[in-house]
Amino acid sequence: DGMIVNDPIQPKDGEHISYGNIRTLQEFNDFNLKLEVNVPEGNNSGIYLRGLYEIQVVDSYGKELDSHNMGALYSRITPSEAAEKPAGEWQTLDITLVDRHLTVIFNGKKIIDNQPVWGPTGGAISSDVLSPGPIYLQGDHGNVAYRNIVLTPIK
């Protein structure tokens, strides 16, 4: 049905081993990425753009706005407003990255508007900001589900 669920890999005794990241084989320069995400209470993930820049995916409903809220460019750009829904509800992200300028529309509200991105965020798989890179969904922090993922390159 087009849904990706990030379930942990577990041995028979049920102890957690690890989660995995899901990444594209193809690499991208400029693109638009639209998706839906469901974050259970207390969980988090991230969406890495070009393998460099993390859009935070976290249960931050009702929390003070900062650069670690849902939809933020992690530790770099704080959303202009809180647009989160309560944990466990499906939410929409519409992310555009052109050159090194980022726009994020979260649940229909533009929370980052064509802001410049300066340098990779933590967890980046490269430091080359001039090259194309993969999109990957961080999978080591909890049970976050993604669905209806549409990635459109911009020429």
Residue ranges and their predicted role:
Residues 1-155:
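Carbohydrate-interacting regions of secretory-pathway proteins
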